Regions:
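Glycine-/Pro-rich loop/turn segments that contact NAD(P) or position catalytic residues
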Residues: 1-5
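A general structural motif
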Residues: 6-8, 38
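Conserved anion/nucleotide-ligand pocket segment
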Residues: 8-28
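Pocket-edge structural micro-motifs
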Residues: 13, 43, 66, 123, ...
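Conserved protein kinase catalytic core
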Residues: 18, 49, 129
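Phosphate-binding site of ATP-dependent enzymes
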Residues: 21-102, 108-120
Length: 176
């Protein structure tokens, strides 16, 4: 890449998903004159990619943050991931929760741990992430807490979850 402003840029549809329509922009020549939909541009980051699932209780207190390394991704969905306990990721999750005073329930965000820049958040979603089953199996219990909140029961989410748990996804065919 001939770096545009020293680092390449990442271009993707605002309403996109599953890695549809993404492009790496290394020079002005990589840009089209027009796009069929609104596009978002951000700095292209390097390094390992992580998703952090968090649970924020009714008073706005973060009750759990479970990061997982996205070891292998297919069509935007993690197919191999591993939980990773890191104090810096927990601090980022706490700061994010504090920066979103109205946020409640389950959120997820993604970051790259860029070797030059350090961890950089690039996406925040007010929903369960696609890799949430890994966080749940590791001890997050966030879905259970959504239900407990709705019926007024005490929460079970905590910071006590299994580090180093690996999840593998696979496809199977069914013939009728």
């Amino acid at each position: 890449c001939q770096y545009l402003s020293k680092r390449p840029l990442f271009l993707f549809p605002v309403a996109g998903s599953a890695s549809r329509g993404v492009a790496l922009i290394c020079s002005p020549a990589d840009l089209k004159h027009e796009y069929d939909e609104p596009m978002l541009v951000q700095e292209a980051l390097q390094g390992d990619e992580y998703t952090i699932n968090i649970f924020i209780e009714e008073r706005g207190v973060m009750r759990g943050a479970i990061p997982h390394l996205r070891i292998s991704v297919r069509a935007g969905e993690v197919e191999k991931g591993r939980t990773v306990r890191r104090a810096d990721f927990d601090a980022i999750a706490r700061n994010l929760a504090a920066s979103l005073p109205g946020a409640r329930g389950v959120l997820c965000f993604q970051l790259f741990d860029d070797p030059k820049l350090g961890p950089r958040v690039f996406e925040i979603n007010a929903r369960f992430g696609g890799g949430y089953p890994l966080a749940d199996h590791a001890g997050g219990h966030f879905a259970e807490n959504v239900l407990r909140t709705a019926i007024g029961m005490p929460l079970v989410a905590s910071h006590d979850w299994q580090d180093g748990l690996t999840m593998l996804r696979y496809d199977s065919a069914v013939f009728l």
